[in-house]
């Protein structure tokens, strides 16, 4: 191997190491505009986080039983000088595209006397852009709204609402790249991973992902969520995993919702109780909902060993009241 070959490989490695990724989520996300003097008050009564015209938030919409209907980001409009415009009563709600119809019905069901309008923004007009592995904050030209994604405590991911023409012309990654990045960091998203009317917000890590304000006023589904946080026990959580020997047999099949099993050591009885289930998977990485009592156990799915990464939520595991009850 000559010096040129070595240098070429180093340059290629350096480029991969220091590049950042960006993806236009036009095909998977929808934007809803909520505008009017009661826009904040209206959304405040439906969401788990505190809504203001000052800061974007990650949040959830619950049903009356305290189960998640939708996970979402809510953005205030950015003024022309790049700051949040406090004079505007306009908020943008990012929602998964497959949930768009149900979400609009949900909002309109509760929008009885509120002085605000609710409308879908055409996908040809505005789109969500995500950028990650960035060393410093940067915004695209003509950014309409902007947020540092609070779910990633150890990584930096930026979200912004931009004209669709700008969004699609400047992408350097794919939706699969975005999914892999989320999975490696233990971040569930959308109705395929946070199952509507089934998932609980704490089991889905919405508190760890800074999507719940436990000190705000009343909102739909609040009672069970707050009671569980302060007095109950959250027995299951979502964690990232990898398939250690994936390269040896990439055709191994693991599907979402498949149950986990415990790999019993020689001489030990096999537990009949499933320790959890697969939430999502792409290649060798994925997310699993796991009972906390089995975090130190050797786990498998369909006979295929998986390896949890609990370190991603180590601080949250040690400091969350519900886990220490």
UniProtKB/Swiss-Prot annotation:
Transit peptide per record: 1-21
An annotated GO BP: iron-sulfur cluster assembly
InterPro entries listed in its UniProt record: TrmE/GcvT_dom1 (IPR027266), YgfZ/GcvT (IPR045179), YgfZ/GcvT_CS (IPR017703)
Keyword Manganese assigned: no
An example molecular function term from Gene Ontology annotations: transferase activity
Superkingdom as given in the UniProt entry: Eukaryota
Pfam family name, one: Beta-barrel_CAF17_C
Major site of localization recorded for this protein: mitochondrion
Any one of the GO CC terms: mitochondrion
Subcellular location(s) per record: Mitochondrion matrix
Keywords of the record: Mitochondrion, Transit peptide
Family under the similarity heading: Belongs to the GcvT family. CAF17/IBA57 subfamily.
UniProt protein name: Iron-sulfur cluster assembly factor IBA57, mitochondrial
Organism: Schizosaccharomyces pombe (strain 972 / ATCC 24843) (Fission yeast)
Species classification: Eukaryota, Fungi, Dikarya, Ascomycota, Taphrinomycotina
């Amino acid at each position: 191997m000559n010096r040129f070959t070595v240098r070429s490989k180093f340059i290629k490695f350096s480029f991969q190491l220091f590049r950042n990724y960006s993806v236009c989520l036009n095909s998977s996300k929808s934007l809803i505009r909520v505008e009017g003097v009661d826009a904040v008050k209206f959304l405040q009564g439906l969401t788990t986080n505190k809504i203001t015209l000052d800061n974007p938030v990650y949040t959830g919409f619950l049903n009356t039983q305290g189960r998640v209907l939708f996970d979402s980001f809510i953005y205030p409009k950015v003024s022309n000088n790049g700051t949040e415009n406090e004079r505007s009563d306009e908020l943008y709600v990012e929602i998964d595209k497959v949930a768009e119809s149900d979400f609009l019905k949900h909002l309109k069901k509760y929008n009885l006397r509120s002085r605000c309008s609710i409308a879908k923004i055409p996908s040809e007009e505005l789109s969500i852009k995500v950028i990650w592995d960035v060393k410093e904050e940067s915004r695209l030209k003509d950014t309409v709204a902007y947020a540092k994604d609070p779910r990633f405590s150890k990584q930096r991911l930026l979200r912004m609402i931009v004209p669709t023409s700008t969004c699609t012309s400047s992408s350097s990654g794919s939706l699969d790249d975005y999914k892999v990045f989320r999975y490696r960091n233990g971040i569930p998203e959308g109705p395929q991973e946070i199952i509507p009317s089934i998932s609980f917000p704490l089991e889905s890590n919405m508190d760890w992902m800074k999507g719940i304000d436990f000190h705000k006023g009343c909102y739909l589904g609040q009672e069970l969520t707050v009671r569980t946080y302060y007095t109950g026990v959250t027995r299951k959580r979502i964690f990232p995993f990898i398939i250690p020997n994936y390269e040896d047999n990439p055709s191994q099949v693991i599907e979402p919702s498949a149950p986990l099993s415990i790999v019993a050591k020689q001489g030990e009885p096999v537990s009949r109780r499933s320790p959890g289930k697969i939430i999502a998977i792409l290649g060798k990485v994925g997310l699993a909902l796991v009972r906390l009592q089995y975090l130190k156990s050797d786990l498998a799915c369909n006979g295929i060993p998986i390896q949890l990464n609990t370190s991603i939520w180590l601080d949250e595991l040690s400091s969350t009241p519900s886990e220490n009850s």
